[in-house]
Amino acid sequence: MKAIVVKPPNPGVEIKDVKDDENKLSNIGLVKVKILENGICGTDREIVSGKRTSVKPPIGKDELILGHEAIGIVEVGGYGFKEGELVMPINKRGCGKCLNCLIGRPDFCETGEGLVAGTKGLDGFMREYLYDDPKYLVKIPPAIKDIAILAQPLADIEKSVESILTSQKRIPIWTCDDGTLNCRKALVVGTGPTGILFSLVLRTYGFQVWIANRRELLDNEKEILDEPRILFYNSAKGYESLVKDVDKFDLIIDTTGASASIIQELVPLLQINGVLGLFGFPRYDNFSLDYKIVQDFVINNRIIIGLDNGQKPHFQQALIHLASWKSLWPKTASKMITKIISINDEREVISSLREKLPGEIKVKIVWE
């Protein structure tokens, strides 16, 4: 079968024929899925460029099938799945040892030995066919097939927001005087795909949301943010004027994955009882906090929390939110898929795996 393959840690990518795993169907409990489309994300590009040093092929192999975002159609079903149903595979798999993994929550793996499709020890989904355990498959409603590929990155954000709201249960009451979160203010740093998805989820929960970047918004970004009333702030000159206008924030999310020093810029912007969520992976620099800021952190019950992968419940929640956005913000939903490429256009596929388009939210590779 055809697949998109890398040889980590070396840079480069190719589309080639690989051995089909159809003999796996002789193993009781697997479902055969024909892949219809894949999403491309920043992780894929880091692997292709050779910058993601933690990437590991499956044991005994020197090649890795790329990709952790996919939608497919069931060809050989069973175990609760019917032929013709649309499904999405879950990318993170358990270590088989710790309790969290054994109960279906490898996002909290305690051994560090879990597998990640297309990244760590497990072939990914950029291939014609997949033979998978049904517990790692999520059913996709046909009505949202056009944007359902976003459910994988969105699942990570659903888990992140869940973690934040759970952490705020430490406070007797964090809702507003009308029982909602409408009075709570959130700042999302970064207007890339992750930042935009975070902003949309937070608006869905009722937060007032500001999104920041050190450049002006591109036209398509403006169109996406306008309908849900997400406010933009240009942070090129710092955040002083923003705090002056709107006061401090109950929640701040860093999605930039750039300089670690941004953390010390954001900490002073937190409201009492506030949360700073770190989602992006800083690539350089360092940060330090003055002892007075640390004291202030303790006295005012502020926290910093690391945010990571979602699991099956979060994929299901992501699909619910995607369906709701098509009704709540139809114009926004229609702008989320930036480009669609055929797997037969090899040159364009390789180019898209190497470079991100300006203002890109999601590029899809289709296999039909």
Curated annotation (Swiss-Prot):
Enzyme nomenclature, EC number: 1.1.1.47
Positions bound to NADP(+): 213-215, 279-281, 307-309, 356
GO-annotated molecular function: D-glucose binding; glucose 1-dehydrogenase (NAD+) activity; glucose 1-dehydrogenase (NADP+) activity; NAD+ binding; NADP+ binding; zinc ion binding
Recorded catalytic activity of this chain's protein: D-glucose + NAD(+) = D-glucono-1,5-lactone + NADH + H(+); D-glucose + NADP(+) = D-glucono-1,5-lactone + NADPH + H(+)
CDD domains: glucose_DH
Signal peptide stretch: none
Organism domain of life: Archaea
Binding site for Zn(2+) 2: 95, 98, 101, 109
S-S bridge residues: none
Enzyme class: oxidoreductase
Organism per entry: Saccharolobus solfataricus (strain ATCC 35092 / DSM 1617 / JCM 11322 / P2)
GO biological process: non-phosphorylated glucose catabolic process; protein tetramerization
Originating gene: gdh2
Protein name: Glucose 1-dehydrogenase 2
Keywords: Carbohydrate metabolism, Metal-binding, NAD, NADP, Nucleotide-binding, Oxidoreductase, Zinc
Family assignment from sequence similarity: Belongs to the zinc-containing alcohol dehydrogenase family. Glucose 1-dehydrogenase subfamily.
InterPro entries per UniProt: ADH-like_N (IPR013154), Glc_1-DH_arc (IPR026583), Glu_dehyd_C (IPR031640), GroES-like_sf (IPR011032), NAD(P)-bd_dom_sf (IPR036291), Zn_alcohol_dh (IPR050129)
